[in-house]
């Protein structure tokens, strides 16, 4: 471009008229729509109006002002559109903003806030109790789970006579917990205050957040739960018909709903996780704004869900966030979590290029991943066979809710017909990615799965990461698959799995967006939460403003001038679900007894006693299980019986109480067995009486009845 000289500019310059000074309308661009545009592009173009709401800083003492910036790309001449049209999203957000709680202190300035924070910090270091007003009632946050483990997510917020609960999940039992299915939160504290419960907020539908509801809701008289449609469906499937009829619920819309629960006002916003309809809560309370950031990842291109509501997050971040509670699962891992869209593209390319039968193993609860797999399978004309009940139930629920929209004949439970179709038309989606005993893939790897057998031409795709602690069963399963000569694809070959939890850079992004005064690393093992704490310190949150409860039950207290991790704790027990039974760990000897039997076996001895003479009237009978190898049984059994007979005959004139005699025989027998085999099994000496009712000798025991009802404590298992 040639710039004019000074003289040229002077000669050409004319003073513009007043009329020409008026703002001119921006010319409209005429965009010709390509005739060959893809359906994806067309669907994007249908949404022709963008709206960017924001909150302006308000003058001191004034309420915050709202404005909407709308950019219209639609055809001006089209009826009902153009510059005079009002964007529906703008209306919704305007209505939403009008219903929101106002800022806690709309007139506070940045300088005043910083000065207040520095004053509080100076006093707090010396003696934080000076910051607490006399007779001030704090808002109490009580974690019933999630502070010592990944699981049992359940947190209470309590202020005076109002309580809200966030989630109620489980933790699966460890191998050492013989016979236990899973553990649930101890709600003894809540049962005493169930009239104060204003509602239960559900973040998403994973088992570690909802599966305990079927146990605790009846005990709490079925308080209202606030839940998304998918989470509600998963909750209903976990409950029996009777409890389903009593279930009280409200389906919430994160884009529009604001809940009033006692003194708490709750805003809801969308986040991304590996299950659709995940939510966070911004809780306005008498002690400030609390943001609860349970399971999440920052995914700008999610596969099947809407992106996280960054607009609402940033707007809330402009307010004074008193406390931010953020999950810690991936806090020790650097970087960002990979987008589910990338995982979906990689899976799609594998399915497209593979001409063999494909078996994919993933979590049944990873509904987003399962939906991507089904879409790709149908795209390449593969029939999807589902293996295992949890996988079948979850897919059926997603079909009912409209998340999965494929021809019904393309999805079916696995059966004999799977062997009758061409390999290139088959995909099997199954459980077992963690090597769980009796899971579908584990049974397939050992050729014990009904109606289906793996062959050397199959491809097994492991779309998951190994959870810490599951390494051994996963390796065993992979070894079995290798023996079957199948091809294995896992995350080491290609990105076929992404965690549903944010990593370090995701956590930093949330801290920068919300700018909390106090921070509480939650949900994870101790090392995870400490890694989260280090991130908070790197983001300029001072150490004394980071709340780190050491264990479940330790209380976080919010006062007007300070937030503290209190020394106060509520006593919590480990509540275990064992089949249809529910029992507490403390005071129970079941787990110890199961451990002894699992490690060392069990030996039972039956003494038949004449109650008049106290003499043995028959040979001592002995039975054992898991005790010694078959070639040793006869020899060791004989030694034990002879020792037991000698001890009984030597003591029979002395004992007055049968329980004392049982304890003495058990103790001496244990020492003897330890000498001959080097370990002590569970020993169960039992007496059977003949000739006389022994009432008065051993209590109310009927004739010819063995003492089988003695507790483990009475048998000496109380050490």
Model-identified regions with their sequence ranges:
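Intrinsically disordered, low-complexity RNA-associated tracts
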Residues: 1-121
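His/Asp/Glu-rich metal-coordinating catalytic cores
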Residues: 103-201, 206-420, 439-453, 472-474
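A short acidic, often aromatic-flanked loop/helix-cap motif at beta-alpha or helix-coil junctions
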Residues: 149, 255-260, 274, 392, ...
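Short, internal active-site loops enriched in acidic
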Residues: 331, 366, 689-695
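Hard-cation-handling environments
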Residues: 332-463, 467-492, 496-515, 520-655, ...
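C-terminal accessory/connector segments of nucleic-acid motor ATPases
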Residues: 361, 679, 697-698
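C-terminal tails and terminal domains of large nucleic-acid-associated
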Residues: 655-691
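Short, low-complexity, polybasic intrinsically disordered segments
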Residues: 696-712
